[in-house]
Amino acid sequence: MRSVDNSELGRWRELDSIHVLRLLAEHVKEDLSFHPRSSHLTTRWHVHVAGHDWEFLCTGPKFWDVRMDCGGGGAVDLVMHIYGLNFKAAAKLLKDM
């Protein structure tokens, strides 16, 4: 795989985490009963991807895995988290989408 240029990395960094989840997941459902405590922009999502069920809090490009108590920001971080990939493999997956 050729290297990823900075403009592409920047675009992936800014992608809305919900958009990325919809591209990756077999099933995505927003929890409409969720009422955020801090940012009114935060939403909760139940997701099935890569054979696992996940529960994410999403605010723009940032995500928080409620069950694993960790998170990140940007499409590369999200792909790395869900699939357990390194940066290079996550970038390749995004590039191939």
Where are these regions (language model features)?
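N-terminal structured subdomain of primase-like DNA metabolism proteins
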Residues: 1-97
